[in-house]
Amino acid sequence: MQDERPVDQLTEAEAAAELAHLAEAIAAADTAYHTHDAPRISDADYDALKRRNRAIEERFPALRRSDSPSERVGGALAEGFAKVRHEVRMLSLENAFELAEVEEWIERIRRFLGHVGDLRFTAEPKIDGLSLSLRYEKGRLVQAATRGDGETGENVTENARTIGDLPTELTGAPDLLEVRGEVYMRHADFAALNERQEATGQRLFANPRNAAAGSLRQLDPAVTASRPLHFFAYAWGAHSEPLADTQQGAIARLSALGFATNPLTRLCTGPDELLAHYADIERQRASLGYDIDGVVYKVDDLALQRRLGFRASTPRWAIAHKFAAELAWTQLEGIDIQVGRTGALSPVARLKPVTVGGVVVANATLHNEDYIAGRDSKGQEIRGGKDIRVGDWVQVYRAGDVIPKVAEVDLSRRPEGAEPYRFPDTCPDCGSAAIREPGDSVRRCTGGLICPAQQVERLKHFVSRAAFDIEGLGARQVEALWRDGWIRQPADIFELPNRYRDGLQRLENREGWGRKSAENLLAAIEARRRIALHRLIFALGIRHVGETTATLLATHYGSWAAFEAAMTRAEVGTGSEWQDLLSIDGVGAVLATSLVTTFHQEAERAAIDALAAHLTVEDAEMRAPVESPIAGKIVVFTGTLEKMSRNEAKARAEALGAKVSGSVSARTDLVVAGPGAGSKAKQAAALGVETIGEDAWLRLIGDA
C-alpha cells in the first residue's frame, strides 16, 4: 500500500475509481478466505485495504457504494448445503496490528460513551479456524450453521453433531440459546490426517484451518466424523434470557453449560494489561498445540456493549490484535515471469527454500517491475530505493496460507557482479509485445487469445469455483486437455461430449483417468449447461470484472439477453447504453471501457457467442431495497445533540441506510441541527438543504 496518495489529495473521480478497485480486491479476498478456505492475501494487507476503503468513504460519503466492503461480512456461500439465515448477524472483527491502534480503539470507545472512568476488557486468543453458530431450543441442539456472509450461513447440523467436545444437549440453559465459537484442528491431529491423506493418494491440506473448514463442510457427515475436530465457545447470538451481565461472566456460564472455553481468557484494565497478556499469549503460541493468529479484546460490561452497538460489519466493542507476519532471510536464485489471463506479466522470485512459519517457501511474489526496481507505481521510493537482483539475500514474509512476499533486501550481502534486473518487453510465452499503459502498474502481453499462457489461464479462471466450478476439471486437468489440443476456449469444454463420440473411452485411456472419473466429468459438464447470470459474467474473465461487479451487472440487466444486447449497442464514451452502464453503482469509465471493448473485439465476441450457444442462463435475483425514510440519503449532523451522542446518531443513521457526511454540499439531503449549530446550518440554508432539529430527527427514524 506504499503507492497510495493521501485521501485528502484525491479528486472525486480518483476516489470513485479507487473505491471500485478496493471493492473488487476485498470481495475476492473474502471469497478466497470464507468460501474456498484458501486465503490469497495476508491479514495485514487485507486490513490495509479495508482501512483505505473506510478512509475514502469518510472523505467522500456520496461515493459510498451499494456493495461497500464496509457493509459486508465473509464471502459467498458454497453450493451443496441448505441455507440458514442468522437471527442475529455473525459479524467479523476490526483488526489492529500495533499497540497504537489498540489505544486508538479504546479512545474511540471513551469518546463514543463519554466515559472517563476505568474500562475493563476481556482478552482471549483468536483461534484460527471456522466460525460456527449452534442453536439450542429447550436444551437440545437443533441447528448448526457456518458464518457464510454474516447474514446467511450453511446448515452443517449433522456434521457438527460429530464433534466430540460439542454438547448436543444442555442442562440449565435458556429456552433459546445460540452459542458461537470456532471449529479448529490441533497440530498433532492435522499431521496425522495429512499422513492418511498421502497414504491414500488424496489431496493434502495446506494448514490446520483449511483442514478444519474442509472437514466440517463435507456433504457426508461420516467423513466429518472421521476427522478430529474441536470447538471453543466464545460468544452468543439469539437468546431468550441473558447469560450474565459481563463478557467474563457469560463465558463462565458457557463453560458451566459444558462448552470448552479458552483457558487463556483474562480480565484486563487498560492498554498496558492488554499488551502484557498479548505478549504472554504470543510467548505460548508455539506450544499451544493449535493455531492462533492474535488476541481478541472485548469490552467486559455487556450494558456498555449494547450502547456501543455495531458498525455495518463489525462490533464497536471488540477488536482483534493480530500477530505480526513471520519473517525469514534467504537467497534469490532467479526471477520467473508468469503470464495471467489478462496478459499481466507477473514476476515470481525463485528462492533457496526456507522455512517461514512452519512452511517451506521456495517462491514469492515480486508484484511488478516497479517493485523490483525499488519504487512504487508513482515513482516514489520503497525499501529506501533498493532494487532486487538475482543473487540477493532477501527477507520473505507470510501470514496465513497466502503467497509469500519479499519485504526487504540486504545490500551488504549482494554478490559482486549482480546485475540490475531487466524486465522483459515481450511475452515469454508467445513473443508478442508486452506494453505498459499509462496509469497501469503492470506490463501486459498484447497477444490476447493467440497467447498460449492467456488461453490456459482464462480456461482455469472459467472453471474456478466462483465461475463454472465444473467438478473434476481443475487447473491440472485444464492444462492437460489444452496441451493435447482438446480445448482452446470455454465453448470447447461443452463440445467435448458431442465432438468426441468416443470421448468417454478416450478420457478413460488418459493417465490419471478411470471410467468413473471420466463419466463424472462428462456429467458435471452437462450439469453446468445451466448457469446463473452473475457466474457467467464473472467466468468470461473480462479485465476489471470481478465477482462483485459481475453481480452488480447481473442485477442491473436481469438477463443474459438484456446484458448481451446492451454491450452490443454500447459505444465507448457516448450514447444511452454507455450512460446506463456508467449509472451502475461501482462501474466507472475504465471498467465500462473494458466491458464494451471486449464485446466489440471480433475474436472475443466469437468466443462469447460460441459459449452462450451451449448454455441456459438463469435470470438474476433482484434485491429488495432497504425500507427506511432516510435510506440512500446523505445526512449531516451539526451542533450538540442532547438525547444521544453524535457517534450514536451517526451509527443509527447508517444502520437505516443513510450516508453520514461531515460537511454540507449541494448533494446533502438532510441536516440535523442541535443547539450551537454554526456554519453548517448557515451553509445548508444557503443551499436550500432541509434542516430539522433533534426531536424531528428522532420522530423521522421512529425513535421518538
From Swiss-Prot:
Its EC number is 6.5.1.2. Its cofactor is Mg(2+); Mn(2+). Zn(2+) binds at residues 427, 430, 445, 451. DNA ligase that catalyzes the formation of phosphodiester linkages between 5'-phosphoryl and 3'-hydroxyl groups in double-stranded DNA using NAD as a coenzyme and as the energy source for the reaction. It is essential for DNA replication and repair of damaged DNA. It catalyses: NAD(+) + (deoxyribonucleotide)n-3'-hydroxyl + 5'-phospho-(deoxyribonucleotide)m = (deoxyribonucleotide)n+m + AMP + beta-nicotinamide D-nucleotide. One of its GO terms (molecular function) is metal ion binding. This is DNA ligase. NAD(+) binds at residues 43-47, 92-93, 124, 147, 182, 298, 322. One of its GO terms (biological process) is DNA repair. The gene is ligA. The active site is at 126 (n6-amp-lysine intermediate).
